[in-house]
Amino acid sequence: MKKQTVRAALLGVLACCAVLGAAYLWSVHDYQRTVAAMTFQEPELAAIPDGTYTGTCDVRFIRAGVAVTVRSGRIERIDLLEHKNSRGQPAEAVLDEIIGEQRVDVDAVTGATNSSSVLKKAVENALESTVPQ
């Protein structure tokens, strides 16, 4: 009887682990699909009034928040308010590229492609928040 109880408990633990593992794998798959599907729209900088605008992007495993300062139709500054990532800190260099090229869809940082995309989308969302709906 004791062996059956131990066996049943082990099977229960294994079943729970299998369910949790499957849920985690589904989350990872969903995250990867979301990032891969990201597209970028270039906002018309000349139409954006001077000011500082905030934007965020959250794709579960990576989250970013930025404050974008626009002056005279140019991106003058991007402040990183938040960047939750696992190994994507090098992607933060993409913010300087956006300022230098004055466009959102710059090349991603090698080895930090997903974080680069999330940061670019946060900047785009900040700039789009200025457009009347």
Residue ranges and their predicted role:
Residues 1-65, 69-133:
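Intrinsically disordered terminal and processing segments
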